[in-house]
Design a protein with these regions (language model features):
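C-terminal and inter-domain tail/linker signature
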Residues: 1-344
Length: 344
């Protein structure tokens, strides 16, 4: 089946990246990616076009900074996308995955200092394939969590628990064989209903207007990005994340997504501007700017019976805060300067 072949192709690309020396990564990208390949990476790198560009801008500098870089894969699955807000399919096929990149930074990457501190960097990625060729990637690396790991936080202490990002509980997230078609269809149906019939139903009268209890298990595990943290129940999720988020962005709406796929009990969503809103209230101490914002994010869910029991969440926080008028890399530089000025 094409779905399985697509996963094998992405897994082979990852294996080649992981095995290569930094100097050889350009050849690896050229061998595995289509010439017209586009990479929507996290800010400040953002959009890159062509295999050479993504190698030079991201993979080579990252591996030069972290020579012992290793990949831990928590999930890999694939499917045909159904991310249109009007309910239609878009005819595209995607493979998605997430996990950790781990190692010890021996050099700088994007001005992030080398500390030789053991790192576990959260990554998520979605790959679009056409006719067996990788033509697009949307990827987020959790920079805010990285900054926090090396003692240079750029946001207030997270309300949720920091640095929690496990593999799925009681479920093999690396799907290699065909899945029950009816289970896949049910996961996708629930995902669409959750996004467009639940989240988008918020009317500012209260959280219950979205009917979150219809979709999330009471003990849902919600693994948020750096700056937000993890929540270990629906009550914690609503209190620690959803309430502050909606106070800041009360008119937020899920848009047509670049990818919404399911395989078995796993669901994935990706959108470069997947949520649009107005920054109407303070968020993580950043005052309301009144500016329109577009949230770039990735999500992964695990369904058990009729509820989602786990949700792994990526938000491009550097891009989000830039739209609100705050430069998180400038905050990093300030933290570095402050630490350097301390008496040794």
């Amino acid at each position: 089946m094409q779905t399985q072949a697509n996963k094998d192709q992405v897994l082979a690309y990852w294996a080649a990246l992981d095995a290569a020396h930094a100097d050889d990564l350009g050849a690896v990208c050229a061998a595995h990616l289509a010439p017209e390949f586009t990479w929507n990476g996290p800010a400040p790198m953002s959009l890159q076009t062509g295999p050479t560009a993504v190698s030079k801008v991201f993979w080579q500098p990252l591996k030069q900074a972290i020579p012992d870089l290793k990949r831990e894969i928590h999930m890999v699955f694939a499917g045909a996308s159904s991310g249109r807000a009007d309910g239609g399919t878009d005819g595209e096929t995607w493979v998605c995955g997430t996990g950790y990149l781990s190692g010890h930074a021996q050099g700088q990457f994007l001005d992030i200092p080398a500390t030789d501190h053991p790192l576990r960097l959260r990554w998520g990625a979605f790959y679009k394939l056409r006719q067996g060729r990788i033509i697009e990637c949307q990827m987020i690396l959790d920079f805010v969590d990285w900054f926090d790991q090396i003692g240079l936080p750029v946001l207030p202490k997270s309300r949720g628990i920091a640095h929690v990002y496990p593999a799925p509980t009681g479920y093999d997230g690396v799907i290699r064989g065909p899945q029950d078609i009816s289970q896949t269809a049910e996961t996708l149906r629930m995902g669409r209903q959750f996004l467009y019939g639940g989240l988008n139903r918020y009317d500012a009268s209260g959280l219950t207007s979205m009917g979150m209890a219809d979709f999330f298990h009471p003990n849902v595990k919600w693994y948020g990005p750096g700056g937000i943290g993890a929540c270990f129940s629906l009550t914690e999720f609503e209190t620690l994340h959803q309430t502050p988020w909606l106070e800041a962005f009360p008119d937020r709406k899920v848009q047509t997504l670049d990818a919404l796929i399911a395989e078995g009990a796993l669901l994935g969503a990706a959108g470069v501007a997947g949520v649009c809103a107005t920054h109407s209230g303070a968020y993580l101490t950043t005052p309301a700017s009144g500016k329109p914002i577009a949230v770039s994010g990735l999500d992964f869910w695990l369904r058990q019976d009729d509820k989602f029991t786990e949700n792994w969440v990526f938000v491009d926080m550097v891009d989000l805060f830039a739209q609100m008028g705050e430069d998180l890399f400038a905050r990093l530089h300030q933290q570095i300067a402050t630490r350097s000025a301390r008496p040794q």
